[in-house]
Regions:
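Short, charged beta-turn/beta-strand-edge "cap" motif at the junction between a beta-strand
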Residues: 15, 51-54
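Short acidic-glycine-tyrosine-enriched beta hairpin
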Residues: 32-52
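A structural signal for the main folded, soluble domain(s) of proteins
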Residues: 2-5, 24-27, 46, 54
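Double-stranded beta-helix
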Residues: 54-88
């Protein structure tokens, strides 16, 4: 995943998949359930299916992450968006 400075993904959850995120370059600001925290390069977090989550890039440089999805259904329509600045 490549998230530009000042951008973020929608606040969302997935019903049928979990995700493991690894930061390769930059700093990610993570919302995971009710927790908010920062991840730097070489740090990771696991998002359980059904858990509300978001990634934000509040820095001035690009954020590069690897996302590994696991579950029975991995299609992009397995998503419930709560807050989406892109109006999807």
């Amino acid at each position: 995943m490549h998230i530009l400075p000042g951008h973020k993904i929608s606040l969302q959850k997935h019903y049928q998949r979990s995700e493991h995120w690894v930061v390769i370059n930059g700093t990610a600001f993570i919302t995971k359930g009710k927790k908010q925290f920062k991840l730097n390069a070489n740090q990771s977090t696991f998002i359980k299916k059904g858990e509300v989550h978001r990634i934000e890039n509040k820095s001035k440089k690009d954020l590069i992450m690897i996302e590994v999805q696991t579950g029975e259904y991995l299609e992009e329509d397995d998503i419930k968006r709560f807050k989406d600045i892109y109006k999807r």
